[in-house]
């Protein structure tokens, strides 16, 4: 499992353990979860957001109305939590940059490695990195090369999400990007190709055992076109993004993917529709027990992954 990849992306200095309460802020609403009494049981809840309230991105504001987001957080978390406390907060991939970086060498001590990583990021991300929240984890090392996964979020954007959680009466203990959180829900060691749709972005990721081979987020087209035109161009971009990931999977692993693991709004049925056919098997990374207006399909992977370790 990939729980260690997502384990401490943006750690809280006050708490060395992942909170046993998690929530994800999506364009459809806030989903919250905690472990149940039985083994592997997950207790979950959902509070909807009206369209347009969340606009995840690298520039603030990400919310058109923070009070509405805070109210949805409070509703979802209060429904399953007996008392306020620390919570793992999962934010849209579009609000974070996740990169795989190679170095000839990298110091073992974080205090020495972080300035080197920060210097590299200056040329790779379209925002100021001096005060950005940065976390990294060693992926592989050997043969004169060190590969790390790096997650970086602008300080103002991170503060916006944390403020909404605090306004809801909870304390953000760990903040995770959506797909990295969801990857921890993968079971088994077989290579996996994950497609995560959240609002106006799509992320494709490839894993092999505890190694992340690809993480690519694409913001889908939203222009001043008619709704049908926007939908057409977004579907076309999603198809292209998935095709590129499938080709990378086959080139890297010398075999085509047997299936796509879907997470994000709409579940596998919606992903199949957008891809324009069932030429490859698509299944839920984490199936929704029942899909209703109260709990949309495909929305549980992030919180389940966040609770996996």
Go through each PLM region and give its residues.
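Hydrophobic/aromatic-enriched cytosolic interaction surfaces used to assemble or bind macromolecules
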Residues: 1-309
């Amino acid at each position: 499992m990939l729980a260690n990849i997502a384990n401490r992306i943006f750690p809280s200095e006050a708490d060395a353990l992942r909170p046993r309460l998690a929530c994800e802020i999506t364009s459809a609403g806030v989903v919250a979860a905690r472990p149940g009494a039985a083994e592997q049981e997950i207790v979950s809840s959902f509070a909807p957001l009206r369209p347009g309230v969340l606009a995840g991105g690298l520039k603030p504001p990400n919310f058109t109305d923070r009070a509405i987001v805070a109210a949805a957080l409070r509703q979802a978390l209060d429904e399953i939590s007996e008392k306020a406390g620390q919570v793992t907060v999962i934010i849209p991939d579009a609000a974070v940059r996740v990169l795989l970086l190679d170095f000839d060498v990298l110091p073992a001590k974080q205090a020495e490695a972080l300035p080197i990583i920060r210097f590299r990021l200056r040329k790779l991300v379209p925002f100021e990195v001096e005060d950005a929240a940065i976390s990294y984890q060693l992926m592989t090392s050997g043969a004169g090369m060190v590969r790390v996964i790096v997650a970086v979020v602008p300080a103002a954007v991170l503060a916006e999400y944390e403020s909404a959680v605090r306004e809801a009466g909870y304390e953000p203990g760990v903040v995770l990007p959506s797909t990295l959180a969801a990857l921890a829900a993968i079971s088994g060691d077989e290579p996996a190709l994950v497609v995560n749709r959240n609002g106006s972005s799509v992320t494709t990721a490839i894993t092999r055992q505890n190694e992340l081979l690809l993480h690519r987020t694409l913001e889908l087209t939203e222009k001043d076109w008619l709704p049908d035109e926007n939908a057409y161009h977004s579907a076309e971009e999603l198809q292209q993004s998935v095709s590129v990931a499938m080709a990378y999977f086959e080139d890297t692993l010398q075999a085509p993917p047997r299936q796509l693991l879907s997470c994000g709004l709409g579940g596998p049925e919606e992903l199949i529709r957008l891809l324009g056919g069932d030429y490859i098997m698509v299944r839920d990374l984490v199936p929704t027990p029942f899909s209703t207006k109260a709990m949309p399909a495909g929305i549980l992977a992030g919180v389940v992954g966040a609770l996996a370790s």
